[in-house]
């Protein structure tokens, strides 16, 4: 039986040493599921509320005991004997129980932990891996996603002078996920050698990418191209580039303040700046190219390069189906980043991905800068045919755990395993 017998939460630590919530759901048949909730550094203002205690004498105010108490009290009592196999019904009960638009009463971290743990428990009850169980919910084919590997960190993810938050490599020319992972790993180690050769730091940021000081943002791109070549791959063929500009972080009074470039640019000027990069480098994806409130600028960027580059809304859409619909209706961006903790339940996450598929927008399942060993997002990416996954660099076990889970899934699928490769960019095939 898949009725809920017990729900339990606790406070654990994430990869940045901050508290986060872990939830467990036990079913009447003894089946068990566990999930840990991630946390972001650069966050959209419209994200669901991550409930923190605010007690400065404990974990500098970042404790999550209130959220834990909400799970162990109100949520556990309400969901006792509920059928966890009814994922939509369970998530609707959680949303109604919170009763706020942004999940601020009980906390999105409380709701999400239970929502994901319940799915794990039902998968265990059915003796299925999570990806297989989720694919029955989504009624979707399965595919191994292209990894967007963040090998240089800047912005809010690193203590350096690089304005842009992530510089990524995408191994699109590989025939399998395992080969793509190998390519990314070889480029990562090649990049370390190149940085050392240039006398630059090889310290890593929150997501495992290197975080050196460069003379300019464009030097990061040039250094990556050098590393790709040194590793024996061809940029523009085997490997494409991606950026997470995270421009809301340096958008101030209507201007984009690029400290590393010593420039303050209007929306029009910044669109020109990005378009010039697209013309010069094999860039296939730009995330948060404009600030989350600069919808006019987003439209300019979409009109300018949206037919040849994937334009990903993260802070812009915050995995929220209501906000995402506004973007679809206005033709803004052409892809959405999917972060489970931005919206707070599995059902709403799957709804956002389904909306993307229906509108011919690409969907990219993503980690957060504060992660754990939890690998749920790997299963979600496969089960929804999301075609791309962002889960950091090729070091730090909190990032590599997701890659290793994808290797396991690929092996389990055997001859039925399909790697998205160049077909990942669905929004560019219109």
From Swiss-Prot:
One of its GO terms (molecular function) is magnesium ion binding. Belongs to the enolase family. It comes from Xanthomonas campestris pv. campestris (strain ATCC 33913 / DSM 3586 / NCPPB 528 / LMG 568 / P 25). This is Enolase. Mg(2+) binds at residues 244, 287, 314. Its cofactor is Mg(2+). The active site is at residues 207, 339. It is found in: Cytoplasm; Secreted; Cell surface.
């Amino acid at each position: 039986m898949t009725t809920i017998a017990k729900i339990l939460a606790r406070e654990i630590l994430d990869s940045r040493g901050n508290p986060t919530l872990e939830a467990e759901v036990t079913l009447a048949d003894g089946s068990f599921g566990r999930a840990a909730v991630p946390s972001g550094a650069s966050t959209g203002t419209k994200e669901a509320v991550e409930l923190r205690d605010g007690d400065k004498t404990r974990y500098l105010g970042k404790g999550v005991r209130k959220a834990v108490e909400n799970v162990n009290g109100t949520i556990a009592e309400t969901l006792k004997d509920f059928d966890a196999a009814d994922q939509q019904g369970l998530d609707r009960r959680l949303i109604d129980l919170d009763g706020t638009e942004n999940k601020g009463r009980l906390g999105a971290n409380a709701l999400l932990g239970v929502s994901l743990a319940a799915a794990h428990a039902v998968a265990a009850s059915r003796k299925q891996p999570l990806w297989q169980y989720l694919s029955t919910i989504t009624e979707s084919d399965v595919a191994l996603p292209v990894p967007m590997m963040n090998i240089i960190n800047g912005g809010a993810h690193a203590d350096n002078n690089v304005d842009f938050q992530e510089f990524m490599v995408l191994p699109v020319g590989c025939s399998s996920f395992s080969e793509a992972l190998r390519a990314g790993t070889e480029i990562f180690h090649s990049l370390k050698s190149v940085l050392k050769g240039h006398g630059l730091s090889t310290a890593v940021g929150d997501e495992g990418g290197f975080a050196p000081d460069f003379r300019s943002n464009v030097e990061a791109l040039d250094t990556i191209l050098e590393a790709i070549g040194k590793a024996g791959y061809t940029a523009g063929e085997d490997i494409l580039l991606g950026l997470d500009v995270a421009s809301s972080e340096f958008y101030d009074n209507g201007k984009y303040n690029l400290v590393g470039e010593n420039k303050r640019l209007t929306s029009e000027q910044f669109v020109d700046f990005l378009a010039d990069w697209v013309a010069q480098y094999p860039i296939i994806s730009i995330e948060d190219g404009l600030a989350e409130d600069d919808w006019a600028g987003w439209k300019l960027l979409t009109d300018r390069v949206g037919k040849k580059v994937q334009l990903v809304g993260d802070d812009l859409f915050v995995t929220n189906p209501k906000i995402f619909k506004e973007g679809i209706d206005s033709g803004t961006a052409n892809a959405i980043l999917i972060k489970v903790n931005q919206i707070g339940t599995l059902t709403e996450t799957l709804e956002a991905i389904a909306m993307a598929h229906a509108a011919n927008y690409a969907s990219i399942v993503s980690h957060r800068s504060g992660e754990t060993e939890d690998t749920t997002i790997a299963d979600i990416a496969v089960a929804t045919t999301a075609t791309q996954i962002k889960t950091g660099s090729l070091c730090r076990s909190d990032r590599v755990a997701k890659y290793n889970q994808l290797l396991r899934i690929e092996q389990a699928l055997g001859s039925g395993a399909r790697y998205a490769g160049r077909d990942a960019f669905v929004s560019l095939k219109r």
